[in-house]
């Protein structure tokens, strides 16, 4: 079905519902546009409107939209179909890179060689044997190591074991580099190297739309620079860059000097108090984190006059912060009240909140207490919930701060931030009385 035959009512409705900052982004008179979209500002809505508008104005152009998860790809495809748009290539970064590799392999007559699972584990066995002797460690489970290096960085393991896996992963990456080998996680790197060897550019599309720009790593970014198109539209939020362990670069926005910059200004997810608190946490801790001043976003902000002032602006929302000293600060309707911590906790738990944790280990421990609405922060990225409990974790680096910001911006109506040990103890007593 062509766009001319599509359901243009849905398209027009999306365009009509754009706010002023979203409209400036969608209709920007520039070939290259980059959008800074804070949490809850309508990022997906804006991106879809931009894709639809470009399709409307360029009926025969080849359009590619890149996301970073299969779930996001599926959602975008569904929402485009609702507007009658069926001919936009919506793909993930790894699938896009693989498809281009196949195109260049056919063009230059070379064979794509990627390690399979058996070959990867054989290499890992060799690396582990050497490492065990040097590090004087008894054993490492190859299956766990394989799972770790292929993407599951939040599995339920001890900190010491995680450090061991990280060290082994670094050796595996170096082994691949030294032997010119690739596995399926390396498609973007493989593509870039091929483009360098053959001095290739991507000339197969007319417009490139990229979601979650903050999750792009330097190699992927350089690849996008070699895409020759009449339109590039990138959107994301540097404060939500939580995949540093994969090489993502939240500072990528600063590298787009030749792009027209737009900023989405309005929040449609959370009460203002929640947004103010999340922003205050980020801005208060940013310099400390950069200066390697380890901190907790509960204890540092709970006593902050700046935080209190910010949270008192706006009406209707509620933010509760539980400190390690069991003092509860509640900001509601512009007024601050001090309430008993456990009574406030009980009130929030009766709302069946989503509990967000930093690690799978924390998730598992809470689930074992009989609570099912619990998730890691990484799994909750891009989602929203009426009520949220955020389990506080130590912030050691900028990635930790970005993860904290993602967690603090998932709530629409109410949010509680609490130390994990305190919360676990409360859940045990709470379970006994319900």
Predicted region positions:
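Conserved helicase NTPase motor core
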Residues: 10-27, 31-36, 163-251, 266, ...
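Conserved two-lobed SF2 helicase motor
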Residues: 89-95, 183-191, 370-378
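ATP-hydrolysis module of ASCE/P-loop NTPase motor domains
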Residues: 106-177
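Conserved helicase motor core of SF1/SF2 NTP-dependent helicases
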Residues: 41, 70, 207, 214-323, ...
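P-loop NTPase Walker
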Residues: 1-107, 355, 409
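Conserved interdomain hinge at the start of the Helicase C-terminal
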Residues: 310, 332-350
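Catalytic phosphate/metal-binding cores of nucleic-acid and nucleotide-processing enzymes, i.e., regions
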Residues: 121, 129-140, 144, 161-164, ...
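Structural preference for long, well-ordered alpha-helical segments in enzyme cores
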Residues: 47-51, 72, 76-80, 172, ...
């Amino acid at each position: 079905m062509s766009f001319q035959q599509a359901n243009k009512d849905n398209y027009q409705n999306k365009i009509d519902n754009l706010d002023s900052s979203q409209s400036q982004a969608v209709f920007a008179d520039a070939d290259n546009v980059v959008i800074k979209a804070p949490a809850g500002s309508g990022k997906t809505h804006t991106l879809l409107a931009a894709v639809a508008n470009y399709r409307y104005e360029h009926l025969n152009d080849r359009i590619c939209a890149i996301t970073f998860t299969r779930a996001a790809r599926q959602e975008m495809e569904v929402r485009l179909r609702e507007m009658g748009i069926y001919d936009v290539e919506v793909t993930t970064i790894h699938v896009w890179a693989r498809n281009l590799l196949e195109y260049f392999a056919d063009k230059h007559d070379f064979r794509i060689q990627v390690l399979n699972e058996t070959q990867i584990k054989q290499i890992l066995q060799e690396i582990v044997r050497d490492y065990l002797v040097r590090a004087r460690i008894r054993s490492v489970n190859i299956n766990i190591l394989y799972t770790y290096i292929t993407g599951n960085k939040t599995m339920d393991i001890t900190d010491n074991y995680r450090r061991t896996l990280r060290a082994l992963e670094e050796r595996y990456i170096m082994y691949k580099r030294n032997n010119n080998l690739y596995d399926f996680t390396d498609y973007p790197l493989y593509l870039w190297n091929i483009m360098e060897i053959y001095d290739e550019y991507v000339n197969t599309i007319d417009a490139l739309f990229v979601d979650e720009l903050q999750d792009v790593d330097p190699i992927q970014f350089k690849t996008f620079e070699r895409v020759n198109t009449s339109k590039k539209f990138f959107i994301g939020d540097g404060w939500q860059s939580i995949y540093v362990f994969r090489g993502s670069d939240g500072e990528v926005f600063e590298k787009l000097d030749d792009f027209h910059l737009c900023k989405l200004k309005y929040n449609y997810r959370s009460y203002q108090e929640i947004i103010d608190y999340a922003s205050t946490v980020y801005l208060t801790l940013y310099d400390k984190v950069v200066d390697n001043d380890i901190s907790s976003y509960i204890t540092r902000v709970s006593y902050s006059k700046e935080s209190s002032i910010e949270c008192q602006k706006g009406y209707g929302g509620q933010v509760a912060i539980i400190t390690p000293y069991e003092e509860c600060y509640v900001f509601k309707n512009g007024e601050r009240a001090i309430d008993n911590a456990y009574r406030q906790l009980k009130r929030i738990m009766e709302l069946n909140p989503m509990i967000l944790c930093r690690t799978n280990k924390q998730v598992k421990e809470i689930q074992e207490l009989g609570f099912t609405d619990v998730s890691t922060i990484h799994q909750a990225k891009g989602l929203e919930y009426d009520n949220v409990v955020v389990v506080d974790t130590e912030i050691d680096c900028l990635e930790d701060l970005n993860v904290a910001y993602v967690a603090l911006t998932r709530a629409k109506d109410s949010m509680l931030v609490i130390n994990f040990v305190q919360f676990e103890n409360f859940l045990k007593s709470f379970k006994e009385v319900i």
